[in-house]
Amino acid sequence: MSPPTVKLNSGYDMPLVGFGLWKVNNDTCADQVYEAIKAGYRLFDGACDYGNEVEAGQGVARAIKEGIVKRSDLFIVSKLWNSFHDGERVEPIARKQLSDWGIDYFDLYIVHFPVSLKYVDPEVRYPPGWENAEGKVELGKATIQETWTAMESLVDKGLARSIGISNFSAQLLLDLLRYARIRPATLQIEHHPYLTQERLVTFAQREGIAVTAYSSFGPLSFLELSVKQAEGAPPLFEHPVIKDIAEKHGKTPAQVLLRWATQRGIAVIPKSNNPARLLQNLDVVGFDLEDGELKAISDLDKGLRFNDPPNYGLPITIF
C-alpha cells in the first residue's frame, strides 16, 4: 500500500501521507522507520532538532539493504534549525544532517521557523534547541532572504531536490515570493480542526505551494509537553462531530481527521508505533467525506495554536 502523491512546483512528486519523526524515541526510531517502510510509507519527515536522524537513517539503510525499497523510492524530508540561518552556516549543517541520515540528498529541506537564533556550534550543543548552551535564547541577525539564498544554493549543488518553509505567515510568504529565485515547494504548518488557517492554506495553494499539515490530531501531541492550551482542549478523537462521522464511514477518528486534510489536497505526517494504526493512517484516501462533513469539521476551528514558542515559556513571538 503506497499513498498517492502531490506534484510539487519543483517537478517532483511528494507522497500525500508520510511518517513524522517528531518525538520518536531514539531507542525505537530505527525499527519504527523500518517497519513503516515495510507497511508502505515512503515519506519520512525529520529535523535536526528532533535528535533522531542517525537512527532514522539506520532504519532506511536496513530497508534498502534488504531490497524492500531503493533510495529513489523514498522521499526524505529534513529541516534547517533556527541557529543555522546565517548564510554560511546553511550548507555545513545540511551536509551534517545528510551524513547523519546516510544519504547524499534530501528530497525536501525546509526552513523550520522564520526566526534566526545566534549560531551555536554543533560541537557545543547538538541536537540544537531554542536555548544556547547557557540556557539563554539569543536572536540572530540573519534575514530570511539571506537564509533563503543559501537554501537555493543547496538545490544548485544537488544537496536538496526541493526546498520549503514551515511556520510562515501569509505576510512572510508573500515577501519571500518577491525575491525567491527558487520558489518554496511546500509550506508546513500546524493544521487541525481547532486551527484550520484556511486563508493561509488557500493563499499557498493558489501560489502553487503544496501544504503539509503537522499535529493533525490537535492537542494530543502536546499533552506530554504540558502545554496548557492542549490540556484545556477537548480531545479531537472524542469530539462528537468526529466520532459520528467516523462511525458513519466505518473508520477511526484518526482516519477521519487525516482524510479531512488529504481530501482538501493537504499532506499529512502522522506517526505511530502500533502496526495496525500504521496501516490505518496510510489508508486515508480510500474513502471520501461529504461536503457537509468537511464543513462540520472545519467549523470546529477555534484559532487554537499549540506549537507556539510562548506556550513553552520562550520569549519569542512568531505568530
Curated annotation (Swiss-Prot):
The keyword Lyase does not apply. Pathway: Carbohydrate metabolism; D-xylose degradation. NAD(+) binds at residues 166-167, 215-224, 271-281. InterPro entries: AKR (IPR020471), AKR2D (IPR044487), Aldo/ket_reductase_CS (IPR018170), NADP_OxRdtase_dom (IPR023210), NADP_OxRdtase_dom_sf (IPR036812). The active site is at Y50 (proton donor). SUPFAM superfamilies: NAD(P)-linked oxidoreductase. Keywords: Carbohydrate metabolism, NAD, NADP, Oxidoreductase, Xylose metabolism. It is an enzyme of class 1 (oxidoreductase). PROSITE patterns: ALDOKETO_REDUCTASE_1 (PS00798), ALDOKETO_REDUCTASE_2 (PS00062), ALDOKETO_REDUCTASE_3 (PS00063). The record marks K79 as: Lowers pKa of active site Tyr. Catalyzes the initial reaction in the xylose utilization pathway by reducing D-xylose into xylitol. Xylose is a major component of hemicelluloses such as xylan. Most fungi utilize D-xylose via three enzymatic reactions, xylose reductase (XR), xylitol dehydrogenase (XDH), and xylulokinase, to form xylulose 5-phosphate, which enters pentose phosphate pathway. This is Probable NAD(P)H-dependent D-xylose reductase xyl1.
